[in-house]
């Protein structure tokens, strides 16, 4: 699905009573897809009218909720990929190496990507496949005990 088609279908999720952030959502997705690093600065260099501060605000402060977007993606994936003899739901974890300690869920824990204990975040992903195509349909960030006890 092209970015324009995606925003046409999902743009309503990025609107509030007073603001329409669909265009910013589209630029953010383009930046994530095109930049070599998933940083706001890198995204701003590869997207026309890209602005690091605007990306930061959209992700961190905009009042849109991600849950309805994820739910709609799940419904669309089920319609396209589900209900076939080859359909399957894959549940797997992935880890993200981190240098600092300020990202939610960061701790010294098993990092599958490195094959050792290191500073990272861990998330569990659900991916729907029909054997040829696949779509992520949900994810949950694992929170180590220290994050639960002292958020």
Annotate the PLM regions.
Residues 1-151:
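Conserved, well-structured functional cores that handle cations and Mg-NTP chemistry
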